[in-house]
Amino acid sequence: MSSEQIISLIGFPGSGKSTVGVLLAKRLGANFVDTDILIQNQEKATLAEIIDQHDHVYLRRLEEQVLLDMPIHPSVISTGGSVVYSPKVMARLAEASIVVFLSARLDTVEYRISLAPDRGIASSKEQTLADIYRERVPLYERWARVTVAVDDTAPEALVDQLIIKLDALSR
C-alpha cells in the first residue's frame, strides 16, 4: 500500500467516505479529493441547495462530469453517493483505481443523514431512502474490489481494516 495508488471510495451518503477518506489519505501520505466539495465549490451551493434549485438528475450529471473531467492522480477520492449510476465513471474508476465500498446498514445511513440536513441525496421526490438504498447497494457491490462494513466501527479502525485489505490486494 503506497501513496502512489489511487483509491476511490464509493457508498451511500453517510457511509463515511469523506471522514474515512481524509484519515486514509493522511495515513498513506496521499492527496485527498472529495468530489462533493469540488461540486459545491463549482456551483457555490450545498448539495441540498443544488437539488432544490435544479433536481436530482442535475446533481448526478455534475457528479459524472466532475469525475470524467478530473485528472486521476495517486490519491484517495471520495465520490458522490450516486456516482454508481454512471457506468462510464465507474468503468473509469475501476480501471484507474481500487474501488472501495464503504457499506452501511440502512438504519446507520438514516441516522447519519438525519444529523446532516444539508446533505443532498440525488433522488426523485417519490423515492424513499429505503428505495434508494435497495437500488444502489447492488451497484456498489458490483463495482467494488474491496468492501468494508462501517456500522459500529470507529473511523480509525475502519482505516486499519482498509489498509490490511488493500495490502492483501498488492501481494
How would you name each of these model-derived features?
Residues 12:
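P-loop (Walker A) phosphate-binding loop of NTP-binding proteins
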Residues 35-83, 87-94:
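ATP-dependent small-molecule kinase phosphotransfer cores
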Residues 95-138:
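A glycine- and Lys/Arg-enriched "phosphate-lid" helix/loop adjacent to the NTP-binding pocket
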Residues 1-3, 19, 23, 27, ...:
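NTP-dependent small-molecule kinase module
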Residues 9:
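Hydrophobic anchor at the beta1->P-loop junction of P-loop NTPases
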